[in-house]
UniProtKB/Swiss-Prot annotation:
Keywords assigned by UniProt, alphabetized: Disulfide bond, Secreted, Signal
Record-given protein name: Venom protein 214
Compartment(s) where it occurs, according to its Swiss-Prot or TrEMBL record: Secreted
Chief subcellular location: secreted
Length: 101
């Protein structure tokens, strides 16, 4: 239950950040507060991903978190969600790039 609350909070923060950011974004693989988002997403992703095969597509919660992170340019979080457990980073990159077009 706590994991799902964290997911909702994370999605809200990512959505709010996209509306609040004004001016140039620093060129450091994402926004300045990406470590905060990573701290929120990491505990959520870990139990959900462990032992599952095609998590980026099959699990709606994790797919949405990964997609939001990818869309916001938070590549460190995106890589954590899709690559660390599944070694699917390239596949996910193509999948989400296609979704964004």
């Amino acid at each position: 239950m706590i994991r799902y609350v964290l997911v909702i909070i994370t999605c809200f923060l990512v959505a709010a950040k996209s509306h609040v950011t004004i001016g140039p974004v620093p060129n450091n693989l994402g926004f300045p507060d990406r470590s905060i988002l990573l701290a929120l997403v990491a505990p959520t992703c870990e139990p959900e991903l462990e032992g599952l095969v095609d998590e980026c597509v099959n699990n709606v919660t994790i797919r949405n978190v990964c997609y939001d992170c990818f869309r916001e340019g938070l590549t460190k979080v995106y890589s954590y969600c899709c690559h660390k457990y599944n070694h699917m980073y390239e596949w996910c990159l193509e999948y989400f790039s296609g979704e964004m077009k």
